[in-house]
UniProtKB/Swiss-Prot annotation:
Cu cation binds at residues 67, 69, 92, 147. Residues 1-22 form the signal peptide. Its EC number is 1.15.1.1. GO terms for molecular function: copper ion binding; superoxide dismutase activity. Belongs to the Cu-Zn superoxide dismutase family. InterPro entries: SOD-like_Cu/Zn_dom_sf (IPR036423), SOD_Cu/Zn_/chaperone (IPR024134), SOD_Cu/Zn_BS (IPR018152), SOD_Cu_Zn_dom (IPR001424). This is Superoxide dismutase [Cu-Zn]. Its main location: periplasm.
Length: 173
């Protein structure tokens, strides 16, 4: 009887811990200008990396820079006497200190560099993107940022892909 209980308990504990490890994360995204919600992004781990599945609305159509930022805050900060929306999120997640912007699948740049986010003509973003170098575990406590402009995955001709202003943000918890 005790052996059966032990086996049952072990099986349940393993099943629950395995389920907790595989659990997806949902990040609530907020428009930094208005403070209004714009939707969510679901993060899920698979054998290829982390999949970011947006369900976003009320964004400007086109391509947008899309990054993981260093800090888990979407608050504004001040830089050179000017308010920077989402500035408390810091720079792009760069644990190897490369100080270089690049493609999501190369190893010599920020790990927080994601594929650009596509927003349709009606302001919706629903197309998933894959980040092959990331894991869900390392993302907790960081911010997801959507920038006003596109991203050329280079520091030329403009630094950080030329994405510009920060328009929407969410904290990964």
């Amino acid at each position: 009887m005790n052996k059966a209980k032990t086996l049952l308990f072990t099986a349940l504990a393993f099943g629950l811990s395995h389920q907790a490890l595989a659990q997806d994360l949902t990040v609530k995204m907020t428009d930094l200008q208005t403070g209004k919600p714009v939707g969510t992004i679901e993060l899920s781990q698979n054998k290829y990396g982390v999949v970011f599945t947006p369900e976003l609305a009320d964004l400007t159509p086109g391509m947008h820079g899309f990054h993981i930022h260093q800090n888990g805050s979407c608050a504004s900060s001040e830089k050179d006497g000017k308010v920077v929306l989402g500035g408390a999120a810091g720079g792009h997640y760069d644990p190897e200190h490369t100080n270089k912007h690049g493609f999501p699948w190369t190893d010599d740049n920020h790990k927080g560099d994601l594929p650009a986010l596509f927003v349709s003509a009606n302001g919706l973003a629903t197309n998933p993107v894959l980040a092959p170098r990331l894991t869900l575990k390392e993302l907790k406590g960081h911010a997801i940022m959507i920038h006003a402009g596109g991203d050329n995955h280079s520091d030329m001709p403009k630094a950080l892909g030329g994405g510009g202003a920060r328009v929407a943000c969410g904290v990964i918890q």
